[in-house]
Amino acid sequence: MHELLTKDNITSTDLQTLLEAREKGEADFLLVDVREDMEYEMGHIKGVDMLKPTSMFQQWAESFLDENKDKAVIFTCRTGSRSGQVQHVFKSNGMERAINHYGGIVTYSGDIER
């Protein structure tokens, strides 16, 4: 397991490192954007696996936890605030490798898809 996947919070530089490692098969994780649809469509980090808006958290949280409890999951948003809240909830409910992308997309200098 990649050492960055043991942290509670990672920086944008860390995320770029992990995305590059995942492309080479050296890291395994899910990258989940918790912003709203409109924000996502305006631009998102290349490599995001799924969009799970926080406004719909109650609808997707339980099944997401059941399906991904044992995986490393990195949550991202615009600044790291919403993703930090989501990460805290999942960590508190037994997802040991829930990770917050601290700083969010506004601090990310890697590839953005529109």
PLM feature spans:
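Rhodanese-like catalytic fold shared by cysteine-dependent sulfurtransferases
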Residues: M1-L30, D37-A72, S81-R114
